[in-house]
Amino acid sequence: MADSNVAGRAAPIRPLYTRVLLKLGGEMFGGGQVGLDPDVVAQVARQIAEVVRSGAQVAVVIGGGNFFRGAQLQQRGMERTRSDYMGMLGTVMNSLALQDFLQKEGIDTRVQTAITMGQVAEPYIPLRAVRHLEKGRVVIFGAGMGLPYFSTDTTAAQRALEIGAEVVLMAKAVDGVFTDDPRTNPDAELITAISHREVIDRGLKVADATAFSLCMDNGMPILVFNLLTSGNIARAVAGEKIGTLVTT
């Protein structure tokens, strides 16, 4: 991961948000490969630990794209529901890995899954998740919604609403939402603030349609930012002006 110069921050961060839902793409956990990159997971865990120590409550949803992507497996002839369940299992592997590295950072962490896996995780119980957060624990939601055809973006939006998070922090491998694809258009400009409605009107991509509709209909802000810059999770929680903030 690229390191930013954060040595100049003299005081600990002061969180703007009390409770956040952090959405992490599974592809980043693999470092661009199939499987897990321990260095990436460790770096993410350090960033989350910094935020928790500042007093913020953090819940996490992780994708499983570094292991399986149901839609892609379907294109190769696999039955969609079965391939989606395989993807859900991938999210659990990522969740357990992040839990391990957070525990090594001294952060008490619970994994809750939408599919019962009693030996490795708690079942998803919203009130229990909130109680864990109030006690300063990180809660990682694994196995997506537990239903095929629903993405982990949708899971992030739904879980954020149900646990009373103030914002969905959508961590990406880019700096935010641009006017065009910056990989193909060097003149593409970063959009720092935009409304939910304008995102739709301009055809911009923030999250999948179901997830975005949930956030728009319920007034849930989304902050899209670059996870690959060290310290950005803390900056996002502190309300520093990074990435793209989508509000009603």
Curated annotation (Swiss-Prot):
<keyword id="KW-0963">Cytoplasm</keyword>
<dbReference type="InterPro" id="IPR001048">
    <property type="entry name" value="Asp/Glu/Uridylate_kinase"/>
</dbReference>
<feature type="binding site">
    <location>
        <position position="65"/>
    </location>
    <ligand>
        <name>ATP</name>
    </ligand>
</feature>
<comment type="subunit">
    <text>Homohexamer.</text>
</comment>
<keyword id="KW-0067">ATP-binding</keyword>
<keyword id="KW-0665">Pyrimidine biosynthesis</keyword>
<comment type="function">
    <text>Catalyzes the reversible phosphorylation of UMP to UDP.</text>
</comment>
<feature type="binding site">
    <location>
        <position position="181"/>
    </location>
    <ligand>
        <name>ATP</name>
    </ligand>
</feature>
<dbReference type="GO" id="GO:0044210">
    <property type="term" value="P:'de novo' CTP biosynthetic process"/>
</dbReference>
<protein>
    <recommendedName>
        <fullName>Uridylate kinase</fullName>
        <ecNumber>2.7.4.22</ecNumber>
    </recommendedName>
</protein>
<comment type="pathway">
    <text>Pyrimidine metabolism; CTP biosynthesis via de novo pathway; UDP from UMP (UMPK route): step 1/1.</text>
</comment>
<dbReference type="InterPro" id="IPR015963">
    <property type="entry name" value="Uridylate_kinase_bac"/>
</dbReference>
<dbReference type="InterPro" id="IPR036393">
    <property type="entry name" value="AceGlu_kinase-like_sf"/>
</dbReference>
<feature type="binding site">
    <location>
        <position position="69"/>
    </location>
    <ligand>
        <name>ATP</name>
    </ligand>
</feature>
<dbReference type="GO" id="GO:0005524">
    <property type="term" value="F:ATP binding"/>
</dbReference>
<feature type="binding site">
    <location>
        <position position="84"/>
    </location>
    <ligand>
        <name>UMP</name>
    </ligand>
</feature>
<feature type="binding site">
    <location>
        <position position="178"/>
    </location>
    <ligand>
        <name>ATP</name>
    </ligand>
</feature>
<dbReference type="Pfam" id="PF00696">
    <property type="entry name" value="AA_kinase"/>
</dbReference>
<keyword id="KW-0547">Nucleotide-binding</keyword>
<dbReference type="GO" id="GO:0005737">
    <property type="term" value="C:cytoplasm"/>
</dbReference>
<feature type="binding site">
    <location>
        <begin position="23"/>
        <end position="26"/>
    </location>
    <ligand>
        <name>ATP</name>
    </ligand>
</feature>
<keyword id="KW-0418">Kinase</keyword>
<dbReference type="InterPro" id="IPR011817">
    <property type="entry name" value="Uridylate_kinase"/>
</dbReference>
<dbReference type="GO" id="GO:0033862">
    <property type="term" value="F:UMP kinase activity"/>
</dbReference>
<comment type="similarity">
    <text>Belongs to the UMP kinase family.</text>
</comment>
<feature type="binding site">
    <location>
        <begin position="145"/>
        <end position="152"/>
    </location>
    <ligand>
        <name>UMP</name>
    </ligand>
</feature>
<feature type="binding site">
    <location>
        <position position="64"/>
    </location>
    <ligand>
        <name>UMP</name>
    </ligand>
</feature>
<keyword id="KW-0808">Transferase</keyword>
<dbReference type="GO" id="GO:0006225">
    <property type="term" value="P:UDP biosynthetic process"/>
</dbReference>
